[in-house]
Amino acid sequence: MASEKVETIVAGNYVEMEREGAATAGEGVGGAAAASGRRRGKLAVSSLFWHGGSVYDAWFSCASNQVAQVLLTLPYSFSQLGMASGVAFQVFYGLMGSWTAYLISVLYVEYRTRRERDKVDFRNHVIQWFEVLDGLLGRHWRNAGLLFNCTFLLFGSVIQLIACASNIYYINDRLDKRTWTYIFGACCATTVFVPSFHNYRVWSFLGLLMTSYTAWYLTVAAVVHGKVDGAAPRAGPSKTMVLYFTGATNILYTFGGHAVTVEIMHAMWRPRRFKMIYLAATAYVLTLTLPSAAAMYWAFGDALLDHSNAFALLPRTPWRDAAVVLMLIHQFITFGFACTPLYFVWEKAIGVHGGAGVLRRAAARLPVVLPIWFLAVIFPFFGPINSTVGSFLVSFTVYIIPAMAHMATFAPAAARENAVEPPPRALGGWPGTFAANCFVVAWVLVVGFGFGGWASTVNFVRQVDTFGLFTKCYQCPPRH
């Protein structure tokens, strides 16, 4: 049974771990001692590096997926916002993102409980956000969730690919950024071989360590470098409203990484333990993003307005090269996080999601990478593209739709009475929850989508007018 479990993981079948773990333990007692020992050894190695599903795995996945390349663009956002607004928006959107991630987790548990009461078996099926919406609210909600979620994850993958090319250029500028995009597109395509979020255990752990190093490198390097001439941090939006709301929307994007919440929960052995995980992950992420962005802005001030990648302003040293390499590896991992749900959707569309072998599924997934590759070459605007995606996609995908879906699901009195996860009294019960949801919808609709969409569009069009589509080397210094 244990060896079958290992094969199941490799093939990408998503079996309930608690039931299977119990069966494995029971069978191991009655098997031959030598065979049982070998199986246990294989299973131990697989579990250590390959097969995660604990609360800690979920925490590492959430934190690792949330921070990634945005660490390098947040100083740019601070230069657009000013120090006080930059700090305030990070804390505010961090809390708001944690709230909507909690709502998504509640809806997942509600959907899964209802379906399992109807004897639906999810052993060979990964539940996704659009299916939760479909099961709870119907096909119109499903279509909206599918459209926004897939489009966001598509561009989220594009952003990781753009970031890879932008970063590697700072340690090897013999090739332009567009050529590096081609190269890293081929490298990132290897994520088709990772079956599910179960299998990111060691990668999410290493990814977070790598980004932690990069964050503290930025902080220390900025302080050691000291203030440049003319670096006078502003306290508010003293430039233009376009810059201000573009920066705010980039932070909205930063804390909107919970579009993969359902897939992470489904990979857990006990998904109901997820409720506070995203908040805990956000708390750690803030210890990385706040010091690094504040220190960089303190040191370089308005110079960041023309350098959306923080690496561009720091002198080349072995410490910076190490940070670049580690960030590249983490961006490869984050590309997999963003792309894996798209792989699942595509597998379901062409009918290979259930029981196909790992090689067949990998081959079937390859077409998903091609449009990502193409879009990264068309729009290589590292930094401005984050705000555009944040305003038009993140606003709806992980803020507005979850809040509205939660209210619609539990609007009937019977649904509230029979809720699997009723809101805690500390949050005001149902009235407090509904009030918080209404605030999220109104705020994000007006500030994130409205003002943020306007500002991000203006800024994005400026980048196109200045650099053009398919530009070979976005924001590269002139060669002498």
Swiss-Prot record:
Topology versus the membrane: Multi-pass membrane protein
Ranges in the topological domain labelled Extracellular: 85-86, 165-179, 225-241, 297-323, 387, 455-480
GO biological process, one term: amino acid transmembrane transport
Subcellular location(s) of the protein: Cell membrane
Organism superkingdom: Eukaryota
Keywords assigned: Amino-acid transport, Auxin signaling pathway, Cell membrane, Membrane, Symport, Transmembrane, Transmembrane helix, Transport
Coiled-coil regions listed in the entry: none
Similarity comment text for this entry: Belongs to the amino acid/polyamine transporter 2 family. Amino acid/auxin permease (AAAP) (TC 2.A.18.1) subfamily.
Function: Carrier protein involved in proton-driven auxin influx. May mediate the formation of auxin gradient from developing leaves (site of auxin biosynthesis) to tips.
Listed name of the protein: Putative auxin transporter-like protein 4
Biological source species: Oryza sativa subsp. japonica
Source lineage: Eukaryota, Viridiplantae, Streptophyta, Embryophyta, Tracheophyta
